[in-house]
From Swiss-Prot:
Glycans are attached at residues 105, 110. The keyword Transmembrane applies. One of its GO terms (biological process) is gene expression. The chain crosses the membrane at residues 173-193, 202-222, 249-269, 284-304, 321-341, 360-380, 389-409. It is a multi-pass membrane protein. InterPro entries: GPR180-like_N, GPR180/TMEM145, GPR180/TMEM145_TM. Pfam families: GP180_GOLD, GPR180-TMEM145_TM. This is Integral membrane protein GPR180. Keywords: Glycoprotein, Membrane, Signal, Transmembrane, Transmembrane helix. Its main location: membrane. Residues 1-22 form the signal peptide. It is found in: Membrane. Changing residue 32 to N: In a breast cancer sample; somatic mutation.
């Protein structure tokens, strides 16, 4: 596992993304940036309900009035049509097609976005009298610092909710998830610790599986802390959001290495038709090399996807090349491991061991295929629901997969009966020192 630790350190050093973009935005309105891009992009938000609110505070009113500073709000679909239109709209024509406009001539401005039949994404742009001019020198004027708060109506209809339509419900979900982890820890932590402490054939597998579970629990806790703060100020704790993503990726790497080492080790030993040695986890250089190579490949794709996606989620709808390659990799892994286990199952005569391999195959396939399947299913949902469906669905499916694997590895009766049949072919035997008797 030393290589895995080095990989985790490398991920920490190479990638520490920004947290989720807050809905309390701070920055500066820049005439230069607005002129270069024909409108400075400030942010986007998924408004819903009848009393959504955009609040902007500025200090330098004189500069704003002198520059004729304005904010332009475009619905996402309308803005996309403008960008893809073949009419070749000029800068001023594009800005004139904004659904909502706000002139900034006061310290604080409130704009109500109402009568929204369904949640919609709105893009906010800044522009002034210099934006559509060709003269660059006139735009070299003082920037305007601002604070912008984007709010949706809460359950009572008051604009106090910092969560966009695509984020609503995630705070409550992570609270329930942390609560479930806490209850499970209170019930099973002691017995699990005793099982790990005793050692035995499943010692290393249980350690790696428990480490992956702890990383997932840490990710859920970090997300809950971030969203709890986010619900109050619209910013949250970006460090905790980044920490949650890192924990999740580390957990994915742990589980991938575990499952690959087990499956590849069994397959290679079966191909050699060696009956004089037990099926060992990570027993051959070939299985180790294959596992490390695939883990490195997934890690590179995860890093690539995170750098390309500015929103930074642990799970994505896969609209870029890196995300598509991740889906292809996971499908290929599920198919290859499924085929390898199927070959083992078909030639296995022992009913108990065949049952073991079938259950393990279910856990593997569920772990690898849940993300691609949910990414495909999410297409039928609205844009604002897709990331939420994938995030919640993947976490629940992978949790079920870990429960299946835990029950399998901790099944005393199954391993006792299998070991009594033949300790030489006992699945998951770590070393020859454990051949003499089963350990639980």
């Amino acid at each position: 596992m030393g290589g895995l630790r080095l990989l985790a350190v490398a991920l920490t050093c190479c990638w520490w993304p920004q947290g989720s973009q807050g809905k309390t935005l701070r920055g500066s309105f820049s005439s230069t940036a607005a002129q270069d891009a024909q409108g400075q992009r400030i942010g986007h938000f998924e408004f819903h309900g009848d009393h959504a609110l955009l609040c902007v505070r500025i200090n330098n009113i004189a500069v704003a009035v002198g520059k004729e500073a304005k904010l332009y709000l475009f619905q996402a679909q309308e803005w996309l049509k403008l960008q893809q239109s073949s009419h070749g709209y000029s800068c001023s024509e594009k800005l004139s097609k904004a659904q909502l406009t706000m002139t900034m001539n006061q310290t604080e401005h409130n704009l109500t976005v109402s009568q929204i039949p369904s949640p919609q994404t709105w893009h906010v742009f800044y522009a002034d009298k210099y934006t559509c001019q060709d003269d660059k020198e006139n735009s070299q004027v003082e920037d305007i610092p601002f604070e912008m708060v984007l709010l949706n109506p809460d359950a009572e209809g008051n604009p106090f909710d910092h969560f966009s339509a695509g984020e609503s419900g995630l705070h409550e979900f992570f609270f329930l998830l942390v609560l479930v982890y806490f209850v499970i820890a209170c019930i099973y932590a002691q017995s699990l610790w005793q099982a790990i402490k005793k050692g035995g054939p499943m010692h290393m597998i249980l350690k790696v599986l428990t480490t992956a579970l702890l990383l997932q629990a840490g990710s859920a806790l970090a997300n809950y802390i971030h969203f709890s703060s986010y619900s109050k100020d619209g910013i949250g704790v970006p460090f905790m959001g980044s920490l949650a993503e890192f924990f999740d990726i580390a957990s994915q790497i742990q589980m991938l290495y575990l499952l690959l080492s087990l499956c590849m080790g069994w397959t290679i030993v079966r191909m050699k038709k060696s009956q004089s040695r037990p099926l060992q986890w990570d027993s051959t250089p070939a299985s180790t090399g294959i596992a490390v190579f695939i883990v490195m490949t997934q890690s590179v794709l995860l890093l690539w996807e995170q750098f390309e996606d500015i929103s930074h989620h642990s799970y994505h709808s896969h609209h870029n090349l890196a995300g598509i390659l991740l889906i292809v990799l996971r499908i290929c892994l599920a198919l290859s491991l499924g085929c390898g286990l199927y070959q083992i199952i078909t030639v296995e005569r022992s009913t108990l061991k065949r049952e073991f391999y079938i259950t393990f195959a279910k856990g593997c396939i569920l772990w690898f295929l849940c993300h691609p399947v949910l990414a495909c299913i999410s297409v039928i949902f609205s844009d604002y629901q897709r990331d939420k469906v994938i995030t919640i669905g993947v976490i629940l499916c992978q949790s079920v997969s870990m429960v299946i694997l835990y029950r399998l590895f901790l099944s005393h009766s199954l391993y006792w009966e299998v070991s009594s049949l033949s300790s030489v072919t006992l699945p998951l035997t770590i070393s020859s020192g454990h051949k003499s008797r089963p350990h639980f």
